[in-house]
């Protein structure tokens, strides 16, 4: 069964709106094959009330992963995370292949890029969603993501340190396998 936009919002809203939560945005990017594009665009145009909504970037590809739902917003609705010329492709493919939660290196959020405040001060956690009954051969349905700023994470850690918990940060980038 497909996830309705209202169900996605109902799940995401408490995550983002908690007072002590560093999560800024949640999103779902739906996996599409070329024959599914027209139906997807028709549904998304009705949902967004934007008759001109399209995939970004345009063009023919073997598969697509456009931003479909988001909370509190989807600033670049329809952006294909599998597009060759976007910086998200490698980390999205990694999330799909690992079938585990993955985290980006420090990155600038799309929302900040649009507003002209493009600092690499955020992380995005991603989890691939699979369902053998509804999708292509490997069951891939899409990606769910949570975006949060580093300052928000640090404020959480600072808060917990007052309650007797302590953390140690270390640079472990040399341990990442590419």
PLM feature spans:
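Intrinsically disordered, low-complexity polar/acidic regions
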Residues: 2-178
